[in-house]
């Protein structure tokens, strides 16, 4: 009987963490249209993670690279030489990191 009482808090903890987790798109590489052509999956966030996507463009707006993931995320835009790297974050709804281009 004592074992069952100990398992109850563990089970409730696992249930709560799965309810609080957010599902996001995960893609190693997508093209300029948002089509994932390498590593298309769904990920589930861990504590402190949200949905994220990164887009790399040239200064004149030409698409170079993009990916999607579950990650600890800070929205930033950084210029690196002739490239602009934009990191985007969201947590409002599941799969909020869908890319529309």
UniProtKB/Swiss-Prot annotation:
<feature type="disulfide bond">
    <location>
        <begin position="73"/>
        <end position="89"/>
    </location>
</feature>
<protein>
    <recommendedName>
        <fullName>Urinary protein 3</fullName>
    </recommendedName>
</protein>
<keyword id="KW-1015">Disulfide bond</keyword>
<dbReference type="InterPro" id="IPR016054">
    <property type="entry name" value="LY6_UPA_recep-like"/>
</dbReference>
<feature type="disulfide bond">
    <location>
        <begin position="90"/>
        <end position="96"/>
    </location>
</feature>
<keyword id="KW-0732">Signal</keyword>
<feature type="domain" description="UPAR/Ly6">
    <location>
        <begin position="22"/>
        <end position="99"/>
    </location>
</feature>
<feature type="disulfide bond">
    <location>
        <begin position="27"/>
        <end position="36"/>
    </location>
</feature>
<dbReference type="GO" id="GO:0005576">
    <property type="term" value="C:extracellular region"/>
</dbReference>
<dbReference type="GO" id="GO:0001971">
    <property type="term" value="P:negative regulation of activation of membrane attack complex"/>
</dbReference>
<dbReference type="GO" id="GO:0001848">
    <property type="term" value="F:complement binding"/>
</dbReference>
<dbReference type="GO" id="GO:0005886">
    <property type="term" value="C:plasma membrane"/>
</dbReference>
<feature type="disulfide bond">
    <location>
        <begin position="24"/>
        <end position="51"/>
    </location>
</feature>
<feature type="signal peptide">
    <location>
        <begin position="1"/>
        <end position="21"/>
    </location>
</feature>
<feature type="disulfide bond">
    <location>
        <begin position="43"/>
        <end position="70"/>
    </location>
</feature>
<dbReference type="Pfam" id="PF00021">
    <property type="entry name" value="UPAR_LY6"/>
</dbReference>
<keyword id="KW-0964">Secreted</keyword>
């Amino acid at each position: 009987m004592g074992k069952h009482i100990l398992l109850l808090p563990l089970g409730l903890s696992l249930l709560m963490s799965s309810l609080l987790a957010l599902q996001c798109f995960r893609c190693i590489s997508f093209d300029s249209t948002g089509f994932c052509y390498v590593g298309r999956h769904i990920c589930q966030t861990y504590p402190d993670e949200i949905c994220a996507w990164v887009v790399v463009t040239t200064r004149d707006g030409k698409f170079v690279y993009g990916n999607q993931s579950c990650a600890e995320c800070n929205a930033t835009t950084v210029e690196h030489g002739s490239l602009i790297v934009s990191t985007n974050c969201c947590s409002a709804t599941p799969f909020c990191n869908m890319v529309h281009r």
